[in-house]
Amino acid sequence: MDTIRPRKFEFAVLVAIIGILAVGLMSALDRVRESFEEAAVQSEAAAIRVELLDWLAHREIIGGKLPESRNPIRWIAQQPENYLGELDGAPKERGVWYFDSRRQELVYRFRFEREARFRLVRGAEAASVPGSFVGVGLRRIEVVSKTVK
């Protein structure tokens, strides 16, 4: 009987240690998942910028006027796979792109309570945007870290 009690205690300590390690591992995996999602957003934004540059270079050679729309997705041929369209407010879905028609911004809603916002800029404002061409560029405005419902 005396040997059973220490074994139960050792087992309880082992379970507690494994539980603490599991919680630490889960939080580390969440941070990695957030980093991967941020990298995917940056990659998609870069692809949109490249398509904008391609479209603008084509327009510069052929001529014609620029679209009036402030939605960069309307300027390009290939929209992001998870693009919901032009909306007046934030959608319920997460991990999606949409154009906020009130703020005139392209938005990505992260799965982890954040948003990345981009704005199509023109004229003198575009001069400070990396990758701008003929006075047009896509600028990352902010990453909003808040609870968005």
Functional labels for PLM-detected ranges:
Residues 5-7, 61-62, 131:
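Short, intrinsically disordered/low-complexity patches at protein termini
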